[in-house]
C-alpha cells in the first residue's frame, strides 16, 4: 500500500503536476507527480521538495490512475 498527501488535484503546468509526497508502509518517502499524457504517477526516491505533508490512504483525484509498475522508478 502506498500513502500520499490527500489533495483534490495538484496544479498542472504543461501536463505535469506539482510534486506530492508519497510514503510506503515502511515509512520510506518518495515524491510523486502526475503526468497527464502518461496516465500514471512517477516517483523520485528520497527527495521531499520541501513538502512534508500528512499521511492518508491513497485516494487519486477523479479521472487519475496509477501504473504500479512505474512506482519507485
Question: Where are the regions a protein language model picked out?
Answer:
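Generic N-terminal leader/processing signal
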Residues: 4-7, 42, 67
Amino acid at each position: 500500500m502506498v500513502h500520499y498527501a490527500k489533495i483534490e488535484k495538484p496544479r498542472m503546468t504543461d501536463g505535469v503536476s506539482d510534486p506530492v509526497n508519497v510514503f510506503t508502509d515502511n515509512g520510506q518517502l518518495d515524491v510523486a507527480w502526475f503526468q497527464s499524457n502518461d496516465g500514471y504517477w512517477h516517483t523520485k526516491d528520497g527527495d521531499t521538495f520541501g513538502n512534508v505533508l500528512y499521511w492518508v490512504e491513497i485516494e487519486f483525484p477523479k479521472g487519475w490512475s496509477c501504473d504500479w509498475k512505474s512506482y519507485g522508478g
